[in-house]
């Protein structure tokens, strides 16, 4: 799987100065999302119209996602102010053989979406996550009690890592947090949007049997992402041959 690699490389270059997070334990999760009013919050990262970027990218290339690690550009939660720009980017390295099998079984899109839905299923204690996948926005509200109890990006990263590793296809997890006010969030959002477009295109690839590019809803993405059109045509041929 190489179709995300160009955007992942851009993100890694843009975020290369991140400070490693040293993690001893995961932040506690709860069974149900907690109601958290703003009056009870110590922090709202990405709120009040500030930049708030959330993205998930996939690769099988170990040179892009070498190992599991988590980094931060900006201040840790204890030093953040109430309203702060925010980004959380997750990059997953997947097992190539397992991904090839998912492609053959036409289950790749559902697998990628299932991994994405981790953020909806994982409920962190003292946190309220608001997501707009259409706008690549992710706003994180954190309670005063959670801050008092020592919540950190390191603990949050460890909790997400454990959730992603529940998938046997996941070989490595990298999380990049950004709270630096002067960071170029627009560039990060552009990469986030393109990666979401790629994921959306997989749904069309595995459902559509047309080879007429002019009638294809994914044409604009295929025109720019190397490998997508070839994958689509390969699936069309399989469908036409009864495979």
What residues fall within each predicted segment?
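A broadly conserved sequence feature marking short terminus-proximal activation segments
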Residues: 140-201, 214
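N-terminal alpha-helical interaction blocks
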Residues: 83, 87-167
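Charged, amphipathic alpha-helical stretches
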Residues: 1-67
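Cysteine-cluster motifs in flexible loop/terminal segments that predominantly coordinate metals
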Residues: 191-232
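Short microdomains enriched in Cys/His and/or Lys/Arg
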Residues: 228-243
């Amino acid at each position: 799987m190489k179709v995300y690699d160009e955007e992942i490389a851009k993100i890694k270059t843009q975020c290369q100065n991140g400070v490693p997070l040293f993690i001893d334990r995961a932040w506690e999760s709860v069974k149900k999302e907690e109601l958290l009013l703003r009056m009870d919050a110590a922090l709202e990262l990405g709120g009040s119209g500030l930049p708030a970027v959330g993205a998930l990218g996939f690769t099988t290339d170990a040179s892009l996602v070498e190992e599991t690690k988590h980094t931060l550009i900006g201040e840790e939660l204890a030093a953040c102010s109430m309203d702060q720009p925010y980004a959380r980017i997750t990059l997953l390295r997947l097992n190539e053989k397992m991904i090839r099998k998912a492609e053959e079984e036409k289950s790749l899109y559902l697998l990628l979406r299932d991994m994405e839905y981790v953020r909806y299923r994982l409920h962190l204690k003292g946190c309220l996550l608001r997501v707009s996948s259409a706008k690549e926005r992710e706003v994180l509200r954190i309670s005063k009690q959670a801050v008092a109890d020592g919540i950190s990006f390191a603990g949050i990263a460890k909790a997400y890592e454990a959730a992603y590793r529940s998938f046997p296809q996941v070989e490595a997890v990298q999380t990049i947090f950004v709270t630096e006010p002067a960071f170029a969030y627009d560039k990060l959002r552009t990469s986030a949007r393109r990666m979401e477009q790629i994921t959306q295109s997989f749904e069309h690839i595995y459902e559509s049997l047309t080879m007429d590019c002019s009638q294809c809803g994914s044409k604009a993405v295929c025109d720019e992402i190397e490998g997508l059109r070839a994958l689509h045509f390969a699936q069309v041929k399989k469908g036409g041959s009864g495979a």
